[in-house]
Amino acid sequence: MLRPAGLWRLCRRPWAARVPAENLGRREVTSGVSPRGSTSPRTLNIFDRDLKRKQKNWAARQPEPTKFDYLKEEVGSRIADRVYDIPRNFPLALDLGCGRGYIAQYLNKETIGKFFQADIAENALKNSSETEIPTVSVLADEEFLPFKENTFDLVVSSLSLHWVNDLPRALEQIHYILKPDGVFIGAMFGGDTLYELRCSLQLAETEREGGFSPHISPFTAVNDLGHLLGRAGFNTLTVDTDEIQVNYPGMFELMEDLQGMGESNCAWNRKALLHRDTMLAAAAVYREMYRNEDGSVPATYQIYYMIGWKYHESQARPAERGSATVSFGELGKINNLMPPGKKSQ
């Protein structure tokens, strides 16, 4: 399992986690139904969801789709680790935006009784990885879930929710289909993902064409996730961030892999085409600003992990205000009341 193991200085941030290298060929990884009472004031329309479905279907049809699975498999394994951290079994679970089954392959039938795998791309479902868990494939949009209230004990989602147009509503639907005391464990790309590529494209396009357009999709800020989860009804929240750095021979190899992952930009306001000279200039800027000692260039993927529980009366709750029997001012006296052998040193 890849884990952070150091620091790497970045051009516009004070630090970023670095991940131990693992040889992966030419790449080196270093690092339905709407819920009742939806509170979303309006439906945003940032992404072309039909284009995203086509991109994912195209990626799943490639002769060697596993060649581009390295990042999604790594994040899927980290989601599975978080599932195993919970000491219970889950009779019925859902993987939302499952792709080719990047989470299921790391789970076992002792932990998951039955696994529903839902995705917008039919080819991804047809070519999903094998698992020992009994599975059911469901062609479904993450924005419209075709499941009843209180259905699942566990919902997981890995690197899919950053493409939904209305994240608050999607989280509300996940909460809706969870059973009481059910848990949601998710991962999505964070705002600093591919900042090297974004910066290089902006600099080159500004110089060559007198301005720039967005070429990388917008991402949610980590400060918003806790609020969105709470507003959706989740409690006992956990939100943390991680970074995975992947080294590529150059910018064009990175962009080829993004296409192979099905992660190309699908925002409505994307610019369809950049001039060849602008692309070559961006590749030169990328190499000049971020090149490693071995000549490769890094790409940073920031990952937000989130965990939220659906309320159940058996869950621990904060004590009521004013119920404490000892004030902070009296904590220093507690040491005098303890037996001599147990006093703090």
Swiss-Prot record:
<comment type="function">
    <text>Arginine hydroxylase that mediates hydroxylation of 'Arg-111' of NDUFS7 and is involved in the assembly of mitochondrial NADH:ubiquinone oxidoreductase complex (complex I, MT-ND1) at early stages. May also have methyltransferase activity.</text>
</comment>
<keyword id="KW-1274">Primary mitochondrial disease</keyword>
<dbReference type="GO" id="GO:0099617">
    <property type="term" value="C:matrix side of mitochondrial inner membrane"/>
</dbReference>
<keyword id="KW-0560">Oxidoreductase</keyword>
<feature type="transit peptide" description="Mitochondrion">
    <location>
        <begin position="1"/>
        <end position="36"/>
    </location>
</feature>
<comment type="subunit">
    <text>Interacts with NDUFAF8, leading to stabilize NDUFAF5. Interacts with NDUFS7. Interacts with PYURF (via TRM112 domain); the interaction is direct and stabilizes NDUFAF5 protein.</text>
</comment>
<protein>
    <recommendedName>
        <fullName>Arginine-hydroxylase NDUFAF5, mitochondrial</fullName>
        <ecNumber>1.-.-.-</ecNumber>
        <ecNumber>2.1.1.-</ecNumber>
    </recommendedName>
</protein>
<dbReference type="InterPro" id="IPR029063">
    <property type="entry name" value="SAM-dependent_MTases_sf"/>
</dbReference>
<keyword id="KW-0472">Membrane</keyword>
<dbReference type="GO" id="GO:0032259">
    <property type="term" value="P:methylation"/>
</dbReference>
<keyword id="KW-0809">Transit peptide</keyword>
<keyword id="KW-0431">Leigh syndrome</keyword>
<keyword id="KW-0225">Disease variant</keyword>
<keyword id="KW-0999">Mitochondrion inner membrane</keyword>
<dbReference type="GO" id="GO:0005743">
    <property type="term" value="C:mitochondrial inner membrane"/>
</dbReference>
<keyword id="KW-0496">Mitochondrion</keyword>
<dbReference type="GO" id="GO:0004497">
    <property type="term" value="F:monooxygenase activity"/>
</dbReference>
<dbReference type="InterPro" id="IPR050602">
    <property type="entry name" value="Malonyl-ACP_OMT"/>
</dbReference>
<keyword id="KW-0808">Transferase</keyword>
<keyword id="KW-0489">Methyltransferase</keyword>
<dbReference type="GO" id="GO:0032981">
    <property type="term" value="P:mitochondrial respiratory chain complex I assembly"/>
</dbReference>
<dbReference type="InterPro" id="IPR013216">
    <property type="entry name" value="Methyltransf_11"/>
</dbReference>
<comment type="similarity">
    <text>Belongs to the methyltransferase superfamily.</text>
</comment>
<dbReference type="GO" id="GO:0008757">
    <property type="term" value="F:S-adenosylmethionine-dependent methyltransferase activity"/>
</dbReference>
<dbReference type="GO" id="GO:0005739">
    <property type="term" value="C:mitochondrion"/>
</dbReference>
<dbReference type="Pfam" id="PF08241">
    <property type="entry name" value="Methyltransf_11"/>
</dbReference>
